[in-house]
């Protein structure tokens, strides 16, 4: 009987240790969906025997002489210059104090109450105090710089371009992912086909990685469970 109990205890201990080693916690990606787009082929024109054709096929390799090279179609590329520098700080404090004191006694005690209230037995004194001090503060600073080439995946009705892109960098046994999405106004695109990220509307910038280094920085799901249950 004792042998079976020891065997069960050993199996339970190994199971608990294996569960504490699990570090997989599901997370929702900031940039969702496909991170690239293919050009949409145009309709095939019907030859009418005339020199002038009312409907010309879309030729993505054709570039007019007096036309800039800004992206305007689905599948065109654009370089985003990441220039994010955000800092924020917050502090608050509160103080509260309250003191109170009460005295009660008989100056003259009747003779028949001398045994009960005599010798200052009727004197009552009560005092109390309450003090509260609270202080809180938070500081946050984020800096992100670099370049990322994205693809136009949608042309909005007002001419703005919705762009998405992803860059993957493999370093040893880990992979770093940089994902970006947002809405670009074509007027903010420079002659070198670049636009700073500070001028992108609804910008979503995501920098994540996978591998053993990234897993070592995450808390195990069982530890996360007990952390939520802990009253401390």
Swiss-Prot record:
Per its UniProt record, what PANTHER family does this chain match? FLAGELLAR L-RING PROTEIN (PTHR34933:SF3)
Subcellular location(s): the record lists: Cell outer membrane; Bacterial flagellum basal body
Its name, as the record gives it, is: Flagellar L-ring protein
Task: State the lipidation positions (N-palmitoyl cysteine).
Answer: 22
The entry sums up its family as follows: Belongs to the FlgH family.
User: Which parts of the chain span the membrane according to its record?
Assistant: none
GO annotation (BP), single: bacterial-type flagellum-dependent cell motility
Lipid positions (S-diacylglycerol cysteine): 22
Q: Where is the signal peptide?
A: 1-21
Alphabetical GO CC annotations of the entry are: bacterial-type flagellum basal body, distal rod, L ring; cell outer membrane
Q: Name one GO molecular function term.
A: cytoskeletal motor activity
**Function description:** Assembles around the rod to form the L-ring and probably protects the motor/basal body from shearing forces during rotation.
Q: Which UniProt keywords apply?
A: Bacterial flagellum, Cell outer membrane, Lipoprotein, Membrane, Palmitate, Signal
Top-level division of the source organism's lineage: Bacteria
Quaternary structure (record): The basal body constitutes a major portion of the flagellar organelle and consists of four rings (L,P,S, and M) mounted on a central rod.
Q: How does it sit in the membrane?
A: Lipid-anchor
